[in-house]
């Protein structure tokens, strides 16, 4: 220990510093990593702070520069000084170098290295507090603030100068004006010059705190007036705040006036003499020395010489005699001694015992004095009293002060005197942080935010924060860390206990509850095994207990009011605390003795408290600052920091947490080891919640098995053990081969039953063995809920897609249909009550949802339990069997409700939630989550406790229980909970209840047997089921009858069940609409007799009576798939015999015997109705009894050539290991080897490398430029501008949030745009039919009654003779008479609700109140609501939906399903067209175009042909969809989008952006039908072949980059063009047609809308478009659009999802994962999309080229010309080219065949070239023989084969043979279309196109033309770039002539060149380069 002796005389005092026996370099000074050393290990001089490589500082991670400065300053280099130099302390005013040397402080940071190691010039910005990283407060030696604290709106400097000259903020004016106008509080003094505020205690304290020193001038004048009574006014005007500072031996006044006349300091026993006038204190040697030293001479009197004198005086041993002026000779003991009471001697005074403020830490008595000693880790300062913390081997270390402000944790380094303290933020963006602690490695804090109560642990810099625990916390106000065991102790103000947790938060235990009321602050003393706390509750006290919770007792309980902060000075063994009401700092010994007040009168509202060395530090709410003073006297009061309201204060230094042996070092506790007082053993073992100690007092045993919570995250299953007190963590996690959409716990075997809606299966997973097996894999739709009946061992599920509830017996694995909902209701929630024998189901209807009760067997009535006040979105159920309670979440209304399921009565459990979703009951706690968030909430099921939260997986979230993984969080996270296995018995448990298939419970003691679909009961006991082969109707009593016995009026069954439910349904007559024997024209405005239907005469104005007549049966006047009613009406056969009267005369429900009466190609349901044959076994229930999805349906698995993804889809093997995530879960890219050809390919730094093809390097600017350049569009991935349809796009464009977070009152977007325009977002809700009678401003929901006092009650409770309103306003005298008038007539036409104010009328469904509020009017739902997918017929009080000829109504009676089932979805992606099918989900490559980009495609389904274009190649291809073989190819300039006229087979192609060409692959030619002029261009086109219409979008580019859009319609021959729509500031990108309803759909990217416009014939096209979708994420960058079965399918560039949106009803959108980012076109491959005609005009026409549908039948075309029928087209006018290897065929034989053709054709070309040369030579010879001397040969060479790989070489060869040399432009050749225009296309692409036949090639190469002179020998050669004169002139060989020969030169036979422009006659240009040749082609001619 370090010690100092105090001896009697100052001259004899000696200072003795003993060898230190303490920890050397026990911890390096940091906040993240400390190195420990045992005290006995000695010190090390190799490093000043231990292992500095591991030293880190608690600096906010954003300020790296600050961190580095501090780190360098602390670590520096290794010590190079002499041994022991580190212990050297420099004098005041000196700087200590790192090598131990000392220099003057003034030389530090003066630009010169004065230290030998130049350490005085390091970290000067930090040391001198220089910008830009630091800001010095104005006070001398004031705080040094981190730059981040400047201008943060908070005065962190005491004078507020850190907030001066800041940018304008709300509430502040620029500059310091706002501060000058500030007013100081009553606790502050305002400086005169800058009007800053300082604490009033600093006024006139002898130290200037104002920059103008006005606090020591004017302040002193004020102090004379305001000096409190408990203070002392000095002679100089200063005010001492405490009288205790008077006569304490210290000159506090500065003029010595506080130390004058102090008897206690000037006593003879202390060797002093006080003059009589009390002005002077003399030493005894100055008394009676013959010289008067007192001014009054009182030190020299006659008694100084009196007798007896000292020579005669006998003194005690050790005493000395002095002559005294008042008494003569007296004996005095030396200083440090006093006269013994009973002995005549001087005895030693024990100063340490009598005065405990002599030494900073330890005090040892010595003979005649004392000496101060310091504990390990401290050195004695030069005052021989103060202990300073050090670490041996280095310089003094900086202690760290932490304080909390609720929102932040701040840090301050405490420095020596006259050095600034550095202040910075440790952790920010917090909420209600109160307590804080630090153990040298981690920082801990408590959060008391409501519903976010937690204890958090983080690194020293605030990073990597993790929540240790939330469970069991209510208000954890403070915490302390036991640095020996790392246990965390904390107080809980609401739970009223002191508790402890292990450092990981997993094991927690309550320690002290007795006499604990409102505990606040906490301090621990591990070496003594003690803890102390403050309690400000009913009995305020300072409490003490052993750290294991034993021996709890108060040590202070009197004269204490509001004790807050507590601190332990373990060196002096004293406890300090602050009392907020008394405004004091007090101290007491650990045993409750020695209580005294340190400081009072100067504290306003102290809260936190800490101690370090001789200083106390506390926070004060009133002054919003951290204060400090001396721990003994309370002097040296100062403010260290200002901030918001400051709570806890904590100081860390390694010396404050000394290491020492302890009882837990060798303990063998299984869970918790707690220190205790040595006298009771030093430690004890403790157990967490739910466990107890075993008899050996070491092990913990479970009292009951903990229940577990299961969480489904995609394919990951998390298992969490729930604890009521402690940390939740993932105990286990499993990766499953399925998606977890719904799950339920099987309490019988502990397995989880999971529904996967992607793979459409239900499987069982056993967590113990990790095994899974499939329970159900066929006939599944979208499973919305699972429920498990533990009594009968049955699994129930709800299927929204198939609208059924089904059951599966886990004993027999048979399934049965419980209930089918054929209307518009679908089950979305489900739970079972096995002991009651029924289940609760949530049914979602069109207009509302309701909760019903159904028997578990499905046999019995369906009771509506909860009808009102339910939302229309997700509703999930969970049951608490212990309390007979059902809970349900309502995501639409944002609340959780509950009810007793035996006595239903709905009550709200929790409201104002953000879309609650899944529920789970774990023990006594209810868990739930919210849509779109990765958080799980829970609270006690009694709803008495706070809401707790578990963050599953969130980036930078301390509450996350598993590491953040950058994957999308599922929108809805399913939950399930384990539950203990019950011992209940049930009949179904014994041999399956005697049932052959399925046993279902009917309560706890009864059961019933069910049969699977297609089975019937065999016996009368209904126990055994057999396959229904001949039993058409099974009586309830067991008999088997034929269907003609059903409802025949006779009793054929014993129980008469054959005649049950046979009454006709009441049906209101319709309004004056079309009669049943009339046909309703599709326009809805005309009726014609059915006799005129399909009579080849157009009677309807819209011609609909003559449409779709191919399958119209004139005998029954209905289509073949329809039933002809007796009244003449037609209904779809799918609605026959389904129990609903669709005909109106019930004729569709008569004669329902199961005889073979369905039309061919139809399937007969078990009920008797007929559906399309393709609907059988298609995975969707279409029969009302579900019989179409029977057990014989083959399970569809992946074909052999496909691979199954982990998510269950089937994937084309060609897409496996292609570098792209095609599965969506990346399972197709697992275990892929490295491609050696690409492994070493890298791009330049300024380039972007495509991941789908590493060989492609693009400029870096392609990244996120809005277009896709890579083959799979990965250059547009993660660009932040495309959000999912379930997300909202923030206005910034860089952020997406969940759509349900829009307008929820919380800003989730960084720019807050999600909370803008929320009133418009909410819109106007549909008005209820019940009008509220209240006029109160407080509005209740429509179905609620306003009590006019802010309360709302259900209308059903009004006028029920019981006052439900608190004020009784729901009952009144009018309740009995309100619904009838005085005459007795009913007031309301339909329904009446009596209220105290009168009648409230309402109407039946389908009606609305008239203006008189009494009568009801029919609603035209067809017009107002558009509820039907296709055709809608309004009826009284309702409507009926119908379908077009190729469709039939589904069981929902709203949507239409194609008779040709099995449609798939095709979409293009760069060079591929992919095919996505649904049952099962399969993705394969329909066809591939090698490396060429596919720019458009379409299908002709009935012909089974596909068509696609390749713009770069200039070719349109026809491909056989069955064989995937190219049939034919046509050459066109720059073809992009195309659309098929499926009637004739013609293809309409957008060519060159300004032309539309019609192409016939039969006629092998194309012709232009539309041409637009610049600056307009055609963007997209669509064809309706049935109605012979073409539609196209024209974009006009206007000024400043703005665009306008036009939609044009024309006949298919290009005639009768009409503009349907024109819109400015628009950019339409795609359109498609619905030929059945004659609707044109289009998307506008600029307006983000999907719209439609009718082109049905009327008086003209309807020109007003209807918006179907607007501002939806389904329309971010739409590039492709298709419509099928009244659903729109959309693809967006940059999105990996296609979108399917219903175009009727609610228009809900769903996503379809396609996993490519660059899909451009999308087409539904369904036959019904293209209705067929029985015949078409072109089938009988005689056109030799093109035959196009036209207004009057057809038109013939040759190229661009209309020609007469029969006229032949000239040779060479076709467009056909041959294709080699253009498309990837899956058949290798085809590839070999193509390669063989290529080599054969190349050989023919070589022969042709040779023949050509020979022929030309022969011609030239004949020509010369006839006497001609010049060569006049014109060659016209057309090149439709521009994409041939060897074309360029071929052309160069031909030019060489012709003697002509010219150069083509870079890598391109030109092709000429039939419209005489040119386009330049790539000649180096992998597409290889070639002349179709050699004769054709020769004919095209040498085509005779007539010259001006009529010379038949003239030939013409078409050249590239004919308009470029320089290049053409180069053909002349560069020769020049001046003799009039046109520049040819004399005697040279070089051809002249003639150029003719596109629109000019060549003759007009004659002589330009020579020659005189007429022509009209845009070409260049060689003229010899």
From Swiss-Prot:
Annotated keywords: Cell membrane, Cytoplasm, Cytoplasmic vesicle, Disulfide bond, EGF-like domain, Endocytosis, Endosome, Glycoprotein, Membrane, Phosphoprotein, Receptor, Repeat, Signal, Transmembrane, Transmembrane helix
Residue span, EGF-like domain: 306-343, 348-388, 1418-1453
Record membrane topology: Single-pass membrane protein
Residues of the site described as Critical for endocytosis: 1837, 1878, 1892
Positions of the LDL-receptor class A domain: 89-125, 128-167, 183-221, 226-263, 265-305, 1024-1063, 1073-1110, 1117-1153, 1157-1194, 1197-1233, 1242-1280, 1282-1319, 1339-1376
Superkingdom of origin organism: Eukaryota
Keyword Cell membrane: yes
GO BP terms in the entry: endocytosis
Residues found modified as Phosphoserine: 1926
Cell compartments where the protein resides: Cell membrane; Cytoplasm; Cytoplasm, Cell cortex; Cytoplasmic vesicle, Clathrin-coated vesicle membrane
Polar residues: compositionally biased ranges: 30-48
Keyword Lipid biosynthesis: no
Residue ranges crossing the lipid bilayer per the database entry: 1800-1820
Topology, Cytoplasmic side: 1821-1984
Effect of disrupting the coding gene: Disruption of vitellogenesis resulting in failure of oocytes to take up yolk proteins and form yolk granules. Oocytes complete oogenesis without morphological abnormalities but eggs are shrivelled and do not hatch.
Segments of skewed composition (Basic and acidic residues): 1-19
Protein's job: Cell surface receptor involved in uptake of vitellogenins (yolk proteins) into developing oocytes by receptor-mediated endocytosis. May also mediate uptake of apolpp/apolipophorins and their incorporation into yolk granules. Along with its ligands, required for maintenance of microtubule plus-end orientation towards the posterior pole of oocytes. Involved in polarized localization of germ plasm components, such as osk mRNA and vas protein, to the oocyte posterior cortex.
Similarity comment: Belongs to the LDLR family.
Subunit structure: Interacts with osk (isoform A).
Protein name, as recorded: Vitellogenin receptor Yl
């Amino acid at each position: 220990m370090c010690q100092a002796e105090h001896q009697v005389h100052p001259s004899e005092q000696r200072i003795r510093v003993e060898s230190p026996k303490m920890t050397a370099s026990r911890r390096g000074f940091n906040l993240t990593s400390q190195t420990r050393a045992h005290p006995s290990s000695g010190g090390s001089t190799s490093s000043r702070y231990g292992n500095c490589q591991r030293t880190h500082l608690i600096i906010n991670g954003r300020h790296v520069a600050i961190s580095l400065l501090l780190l360098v300053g602390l670590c520096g280099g290794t010590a190079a000084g002499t041994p022991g130099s580190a212990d050297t302390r420099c004098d005041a005013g000196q700087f200590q170098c790192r090598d131990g040397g000392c220099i003057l402080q003034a030389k530090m940071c003066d630009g010169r290295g004065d230290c030998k190691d130049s350490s005085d010039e390091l970290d000067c910005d930090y040391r001198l507090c220089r910008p830009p990283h630091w800001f010095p407060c104005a006070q001398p030696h004031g705080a040094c603030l981190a730059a981040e604290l400047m201008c943060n709106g908070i005065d962190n400097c005491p004078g507020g100068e850190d907030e001066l000259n800041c940018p304008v903020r709300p509430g502040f004016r620029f500059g310091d004006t706002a501060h000058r106008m500030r007013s100081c509080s009553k606790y502050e003094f305002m400086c005169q010059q800058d009007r800053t505020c300082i604490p009033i205690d600093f006024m006139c304290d002898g130290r200037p705190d104002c920059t103008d020193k006005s606090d020591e001038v004017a302040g002193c004048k004020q102090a004379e007036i305001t000096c409190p009574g408990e203070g002392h006014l000095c002679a100089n005007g200063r005010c001492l705040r405490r009288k205790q500072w008077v006569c304490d031996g210290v000159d506090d006044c500065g003029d010595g006036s506080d130390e004058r006349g102090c008897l206690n300091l000037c006593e003879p026993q202390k060797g002093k003499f006080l003059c009589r006038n009390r002005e002077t204190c003399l030493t005894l040697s100055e008394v009676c020395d013959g010289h008067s030293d007192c001014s009054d001479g009182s030190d020299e009197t006659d008694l100084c010489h009196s007798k007896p004198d000292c020579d005669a005086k006998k003194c005690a041993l050790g005493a000395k005699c002095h002559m005294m002026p008042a008494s003569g000779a007296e004996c005095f003991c030396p200083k440090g001694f006093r006269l013994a009471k009973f002995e005549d001697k001087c005895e030693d005074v024990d100063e340490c015992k009598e005065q405990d403020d002599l030494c900073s830490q330890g005090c040892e008595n010595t003979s005649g004095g004392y000496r101060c000693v310091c504990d390990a880790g401290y050195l004695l300062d030069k005052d021989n009293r103060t202990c300073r913390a050090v670490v041996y081997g280095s310089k003094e270390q900086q202690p760290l002060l932490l304080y909390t402000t609720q929102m932040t944790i701040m840090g301050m380094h405490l420095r020596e005197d006259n050095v600034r303290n550095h202040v910075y933020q440790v952790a920010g963006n917090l909420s209600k942080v109160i307590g804080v602690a630090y153990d040298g490695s981690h920082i801990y804090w408590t959060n008391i935010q409501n519903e976010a109560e937690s204890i958090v642990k983080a690194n020293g810099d605030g990073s990597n924060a993790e929540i240790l625990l939330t469970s069991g916390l209510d208000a954890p106000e403070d915490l302390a860390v036991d640095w020996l065991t790392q246990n965390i102790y904390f107080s809980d103000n609401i739970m009223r206990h002191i508790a402890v947790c292990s450092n990981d938060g997993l094991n927690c235990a309550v320690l002290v509850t007795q006499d604990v009321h409102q505990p606040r602050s906490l301090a621990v003393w591990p070496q003594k095994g003690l803890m102390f706390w403050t309690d400000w509750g009913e009995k305020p006290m300072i409490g003490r207990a052993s750290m294991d919770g034993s021996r709890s007792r108060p040590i202070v309980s009197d004269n204490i009011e509001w004790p807050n902060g507590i601190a332990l000075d373990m060196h002096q063994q004293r406890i300090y605390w602050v009392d907020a009401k008394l405004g004091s700092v007090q101290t007491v010994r650990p045993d409750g003795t020695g209580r005294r007040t340190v400081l009072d009168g100067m504290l306003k509202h102290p809260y936190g408290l800490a101690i370090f060395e001789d200083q106390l530090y506390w926070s004060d709410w009133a002054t919003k600052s951290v204060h400090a003073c001396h721990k003994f006297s309370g002097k040296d009061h100062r403010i260290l920091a200002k901030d918001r309201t400051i709570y806890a204060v904590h100081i860390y230094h390694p010396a404050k947490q000394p290491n020492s042996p302890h009882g837990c070092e060798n303990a063998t506790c299984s869970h918790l080891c707690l220190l205790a007082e040595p006298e009771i053993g030093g430690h004890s073992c403790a157990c967490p919640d739910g466990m107890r100690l075993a008899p050996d007092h070491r092990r913990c045993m479970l009292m009951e098995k903990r229940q577990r919570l299961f969480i489904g995250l995609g394919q990951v299953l998390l298992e969490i053990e729930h604890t009521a007190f402690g940390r939740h963590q993932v105990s286990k996690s499993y990766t499953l081969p399925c998606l977890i959409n719904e799950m339920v716990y099987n309490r019988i075997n502990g397995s989880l039953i999971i529904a996967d809606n992607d793979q459409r299966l239900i499987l069982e997973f056993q967590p113990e063995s990790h095994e899974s097996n499939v329970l159900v894999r066929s006939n599944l739709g979208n499973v919305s809920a699972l429920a498990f009946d533990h009594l009968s061992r049955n699994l129930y599920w709800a299927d929204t897609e198939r609208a059924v509830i089904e059951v599966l017996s886990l004993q027999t694995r048979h399934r049965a249909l419980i209930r089918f909902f054929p209307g518009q209701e679908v089950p979305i929630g489900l739970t079972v009550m096995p002991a009651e024998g029924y289940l609760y189901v949530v049914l979602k209807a069109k207009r509302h949802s309701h909760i019903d009760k159904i028997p578990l067997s499905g046999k019995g009535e369906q009771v509506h339990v909860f009808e009102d006040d339910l939302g229309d979105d997700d509703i999930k159920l969970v049951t608490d069997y212990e309390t007979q309670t059902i809970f349900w979440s309502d995501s639409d209304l944002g609340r959780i409700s509950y009810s007793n399921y035996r006595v239903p009565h709905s009550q709200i459990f929790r409201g104002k939630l953000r879309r609650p979703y899944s529920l789970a009951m774990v023990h006594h706690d209810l868990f739930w989550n919210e849509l779109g968030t990765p958080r799980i909430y829970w609270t006690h099921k009694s709803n008495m406790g706070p809401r707790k939260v578990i963050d599953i997986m969130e980036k930078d979230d301390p509450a996350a229980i598993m590491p953040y993984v950058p994957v999308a969080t599922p929108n809805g996270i399913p939950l399930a909970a384990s539950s203990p296995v019950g011992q209940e018995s049930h009949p179904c448990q014994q041999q399956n209840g005697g049932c052959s298939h399925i046993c279902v419970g009917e309560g706890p003691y009864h059961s019933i047997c069910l049969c699977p679909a297609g089975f019937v009961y065999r016996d009368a006991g209904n126990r055994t089921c057999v396959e229904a082969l001949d039993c058409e109707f099974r009586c309830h009593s067991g008999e088997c009858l034929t269907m003609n016995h059903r409802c025949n009026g006779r009793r054929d069954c014993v129980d008469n069940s054959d005649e049950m439910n046979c009454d006709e349904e009441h049906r209101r007559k319709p309004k004056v609409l079309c009669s049943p024997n009339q046909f309703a024209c599709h326009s809805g405005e005309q009726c014609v007799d059915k006799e005129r239907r399909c009579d080849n005469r157009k009677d309807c104005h819209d011609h609909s009576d003559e449409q779709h007549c191919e399958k119209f049966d004139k005998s029954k006047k209905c289509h073949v798939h329809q039933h002809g009613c007796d009244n003449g009406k037609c209904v779809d056969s799918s609605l026959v015999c389904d129990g609903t009267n669709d005909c109106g005369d019930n004729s569709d429900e008569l004669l329902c015997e199961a005889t073979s009466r369905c039309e061919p190609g139809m399937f007969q349901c078990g009920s008797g109705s007929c559906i399309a044959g393709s609907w059988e076994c298609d995975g969707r229930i279409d029969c009302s009894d579900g019989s179409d999805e029977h057990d014989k349906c083959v399970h569809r698995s992946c074909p052999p050539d496909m691979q199954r993804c982990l998510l269950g889809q089937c994937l084309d093997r060609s897409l496996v290991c292609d570098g792209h995530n095609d599965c969506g879960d990346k399972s197709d890219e697992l275990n892929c080897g490295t491609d050696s050809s690409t492994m070493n390919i890298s791009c330049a730094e300024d380039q972007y490398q495509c991941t789908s093809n590493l060989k492609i390097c693009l400029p870096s600017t392609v990244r996120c430029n809005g277009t896709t350049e890579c083959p799979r569009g990965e250059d547009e991935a993660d660009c932040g501008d495309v959000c999912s349809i379930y997300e909202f796009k923030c206005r910034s464009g860089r952020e997406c949030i969940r759509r349900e977070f829009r307008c929820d009152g919380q800003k989730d977007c960084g720019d807050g745009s999600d909370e803008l325009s929320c009133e418009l977002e909410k819109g106007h809700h549909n008005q209820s039919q019940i009008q509220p009678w209240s006029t109160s401003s407080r509005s209740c929901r429509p179905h609620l009654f306003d009590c006019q006092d802010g309360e709302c009650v259900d209308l059903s409770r009004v006028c029920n003779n019981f006052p439900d309103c608190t004020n009784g306003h729901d009952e009144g005298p009018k309740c009995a008479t309100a619904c009838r008038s005085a005459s007795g007539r009913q007031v309301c036409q339909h329904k009446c609700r009596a209220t105290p104010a009168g009648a409230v009328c309402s109407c039946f469904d389908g009606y609305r109140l008239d203006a008189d509020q009494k009568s009801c009017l029919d609603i035209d739902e067809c017009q107002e609501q558009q509820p039907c997918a296709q055709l809608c017929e309004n009826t009284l009080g309702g409507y009926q939906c119908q379908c077009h000829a190729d469709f039939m109504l589904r069981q929902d009676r709203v949507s239409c399903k194609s008779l040709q089932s099995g449609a798939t979805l095709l979409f293009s992606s760069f060079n591929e067209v992919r095919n996505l099918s649904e049952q099962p989900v399969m993705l394969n490559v329909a066809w591939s175009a090698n490396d060429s980009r596919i720019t458009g495609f379409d299908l002709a389904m009935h012909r089974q042909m596909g068509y696609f274009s390749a713009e770069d190649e200039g070719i349109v291809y026809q491909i056989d969809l069955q064989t995937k073989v190219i049939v034919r190819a046509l050459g066109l300039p720059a073809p992009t989008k195309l659309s098929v006229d499926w009637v004739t087979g013609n293809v309409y192609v957008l060519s060159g952006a300004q032309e539309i060409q019609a192409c016939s692959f039969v006629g092998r030619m194309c012709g232009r039908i539309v041409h637009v002029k610049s600056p307009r261009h055609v963007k997209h086109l669509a064809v309706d072949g049935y109605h012979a219409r073409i539609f196209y979008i024209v974009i006009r580019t206007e000024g400043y980059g703005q665009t306008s859009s036009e939609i044009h319609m024309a006949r298919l021959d290009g005639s009768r063009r009409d503009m349907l729509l024109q819109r400015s500031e628009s950019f339409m990108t795609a359109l498609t047609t619905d030929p059945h309803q004659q609707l044109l759909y289009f998307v506008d990217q600029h307006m983000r809308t999907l719209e439609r416009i009718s082109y049905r014939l009327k008086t003209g096209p309807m020109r007003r478009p209807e918006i179907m979708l607007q501002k939806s994420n389904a329309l971010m960058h739409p590039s492709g659009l298709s419509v099928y079965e009244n659903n729109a399918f959309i693809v967006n560039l940059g999105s990996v999802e296609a979108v399917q949106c219903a175009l009727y009803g609610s228009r809900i959108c769903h996503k379809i994962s396609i996993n490519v980012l660059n899909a451009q076109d999308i087409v539904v491959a369904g036959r019904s999309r293209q209705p067929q005609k029985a015949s078409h005009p072109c089938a009988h026409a005689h056109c030799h080229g093109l035959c196009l549908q036209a207004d009057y039948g057809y038109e013939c075309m040759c190229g661009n010309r209309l020609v007469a029928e029969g006229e032949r087209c000239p040779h060479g006018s076709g467009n056909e080219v041959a294709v080699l290897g253009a498309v990837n065929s899956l058949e290798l034989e085809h590839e070999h065949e193509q390669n063989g053709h290529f080599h054969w054709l190349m050989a023919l070309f070589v022969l042709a070239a040779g023949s050509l040369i020979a022929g030309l030579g022969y011609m030239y010879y004949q020509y010369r023989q006839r006497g001609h001397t010049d060569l006049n040969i014109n060659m016209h060479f057309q090149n439709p084969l521009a994409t041939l790989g060897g074309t360029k070489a071929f052309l160069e060869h031909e030019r060489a043979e012709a003697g002509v040399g010219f150069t083509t432009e870079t890598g391109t050749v030109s092709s000429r279309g039939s419209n005489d225009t040119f386009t330049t296309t790539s000649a180096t692409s992998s597409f290889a196109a070639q002349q179709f036949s050699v004769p054709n090639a020769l004919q095209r190469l040498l085509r005779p033309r007539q010259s001006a002179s009529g010379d038949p020998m003239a030939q013409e050669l078409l050249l590239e770039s004919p308009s470029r004169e320089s290049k053409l002139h180069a053909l002349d060989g560069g020769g020049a002539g001046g003799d009039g020969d046109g520049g040819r030169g004399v005697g040279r036979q070089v051809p002249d060149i003639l150029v003719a422009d596109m629109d000019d006659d060549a003759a007009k240009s004659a002589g330009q380069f020579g020659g005189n040749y007429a022509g009209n082609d845009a070409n260049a001619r060689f003229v010899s």
